[in-house]
């Protein structure tokens, strides 16, 4: 029997009995346009054939039966997931890489933005400049570590401006293009593109709208070396690798409010996300931390942007940066984007990020339950070490990942989601429980082989973000960790960055009297505000 673990995309990791490959999607790249030389971007025909995405070796529709291209209504169970979540696109000279991200934190003047979550096309600015304290608004997006591996910015924060071996990034791997995408339809879409130049041929009632930010993102946090590995050993299983990881990272996107595209990102993408974030509990009530055994009797809702066939009625529209837009970011230690893609290239792609949720029309089921063996599958107990769908990643010694040229072993705990095999590009999607708490982040698919034949390929995997201390409710729980707020067992957690940068999440920590959120206040942190 063989266990294969697919993250479904550009990153493939081999082990003796398991394979870990990325649930982000990748395709060969083209030569991007240079805004500095060409001025405003107009569609042109590429001189070479447009390459097709190569997100997976196996057919993309392997058992795919999920709902796509449906914007949730206000009462829909997926509405908050939709508002929070975006398609992420990182491009370098070699590859075009897609993943999914969601609003995790922010820093900026909310009052000046009039944040109410409503959709307001922002071709003309909706910002009350008289109220602005600064011309910047910073957004922090959560995704998988294996997606954040695609971000290679030589003006990033330390230690991320070089690889893990302290070597400069190669020219072919440096990030040159970044965009946020969201699926829009109907009047919302028509209003959006009606004022855009060069979009007259793209009148459609459905589209993935991608907006190129003015800056290349930076790395706020990676869940690398986040625990003492000895605290999470399983049956004395050891590893030769010196580091550990959870498949979780946070990237920083700095928005220049004088830049037209950044204004659009803020008003049309970020404002609804902030509204959803606050509706779900605004930091302190949003992120679940509960004993592992309490995950079992839950239903989990998943929404992301896997790369699949776009269909005849779905366009892929790129709102690119232009030379005429404001790119004055020298005072903010940002790396401006000077490259973009041709709309003609975008139009020819037959596989794009497609809005997908885990509703299944074939049996009218919504959400996902944790994995449970069927009566005829008792043999799985000898292949997958799990407790009613909860796994300790320390039991899989060869689940490893290379991040910025250093290999790490996966640690912490995760969920096995039955009948939830989202394809590549969905990596980083948030998992929200029936209790409206965000508990984990989706990262891949488990494939199980019996006698050389594929027996199961429908088990989705997610990484739990927080586990409580003193957990006695689960047979596989040995220690706690908290990737967001920290605890005594967690060496590396996001709240340290939030405190150094005085973000919204840290402001909520300061307001709280609950000790589970205030661990960072008991620790010394190192200010990391340099570039």
Swiss-Prot record:
Tree of life domain: Bacteria
Residues lipid-modified (S-diacylglycerol cysteine): 23
Regions of compositional bias (Low complexity) in chain numbering: 40-51
Cystine residue pairs: none
Principal subcellular localization: membrane
Keywords: Cell membrane, Lipoprotein, Membrane, Palmitate, Signal
Gene Ontology cellular-component annotations: plasma membrane
Residues covalently joined to lipid (N-palmitoyl cysteine): 23
Signal peptide: 1-22
Matching InterPro entries: Mycoplasma_peptidase_DUF31 (IPR022382), Uncharacterised_MG067 (IPR022381)
Cell location: Cell membrane
Topology in membrane: Lipid-anchor
Membrane-spanning ranges: none
Region (Disordered): 31-51
Family: Belongs to the MG067/MG068/MG395 family.
The protein's name: Uncharacterized lipoprotein MPN_588
Originating organism: Mycoplasma pneumoniae (strain ATCC 29342 / M129 / Subtype 1) (Mycoplasmoides pneumoniae)
High-level lineage: Bacteria, Bacillati, Mycoplasmatota, Mycoplasmoidales, Mycoplasmoidaceae
